[in-house]
Amino acid sequence: GIFEGDRYFDILVEYAKFSPEQIAVRITATNRGGEAAPLNIIPTMWFRNTWSWGQTPLPEPTISAAQGPAGTLCMVADDGETLSDRRIPNSHRLGRRWLIGSTKDAGAEMLFTNNETNAPVVFHPGGTSLSRYTKDGFHRLLCAGEKAAVNPDLTGTKAGLNYSFVVPAGGSVSVLLLF
């Protein structure tokens, strides 16, 4: 079975209210197996896709790379230029939100794509996606090595910080974030 030989990771996610508008997050992964094993931890932020509904698409929110404190990677999400969708009761905007990740103990890279369906994969091979960069972009990059699956311009409606580790047997790694 899946737990045979303890070849799995325990993942602990801790949240602490840092201030009225900020949450500190620590993600700790422990390798329960008897051998070192690779692990990618990808804290992700995305906007719910309501802009492509209906006949007339609405303006899209954006997530982009931003300058953060030394020793961090930073991205900013902003829906301030979007329009409220009347089809959603109590529709609201979040304004600007930042995701800041420490790079002190681990290197990381920012990944960007769009929260759009990969139509040829989901619907049929001749389908056309609404965006060149689709929501499965991180998977396509990490599992198939498809570098063109993520946006090199570091912008999109879905983004993540990719922390790549080789975790020793019985060892742990942690990722520190501020949201």
Predicted regions and their residues:
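Short, structured patches in soluble enzyme cores that scaffold and shape functional sites
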Residues: 13-17, 29-31, 179
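Intrinsically disordered or highly flexible coil/loop and linker segments, enriched in small
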Residues: 20-21, 51, 172
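Hydrophobic residues positioned within well-ordered beta-strands of beta-sheet architectures
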Residues: 9-11, 25, 41-43, 161-163, ...
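Hydrophobic beta-strand core residues of beta-sandwich domains
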Residues: 3, 17-18, 31-35, 167-169
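Extended, loop-rich substrate-binding clefts of extracytoplasmic carbohydrate-active enzymes
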Residues: 1-21, 134-161
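Polysaccharide-binding surfaces and accessory modules of carbohydrate-active proteins
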Residues: 24, 29-134
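Short Pro-Gly-centered flexible turn/kink motifs
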Residues: 165-179
